[in-house]
Amino acid sequence: MSIEQTYKDIKSLKIQGASNISDSAIKEIKILVKNSTAKKPHLLTEEIESSIERLKSARPTEPETENYLNYINYFSKRVVTQKISELKKEIIKEINNIE
């Protein structure tokens, strides 16, 4: 899937239930991080933030998803590194901890 497809599936109620919505959104952010071609950490965090905002807008009344995505966004901005590979590794590790 993709961020956009997951957004559409959540919005159209194809994906329902708090846990299913959270799981799908988190999975897509993880895939985004793994596959990102961003060359600098700040570009990756911008990409994450943009994607998170898109996913949250699909079902704004879903607090569980919003909380998880906000945490991932917060965490991604707090990792101090100049290496994109280290940032990706830390974010994926943190996502694995909450999955």
Predicted regions mapped to residue ranges:
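Long amphipathic alpha-helical segments
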Residues: M1-K88
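Active-site pocket-lining segments that scaffold enzyme catalytic pockets across diverse folds
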Residues: I91-E99
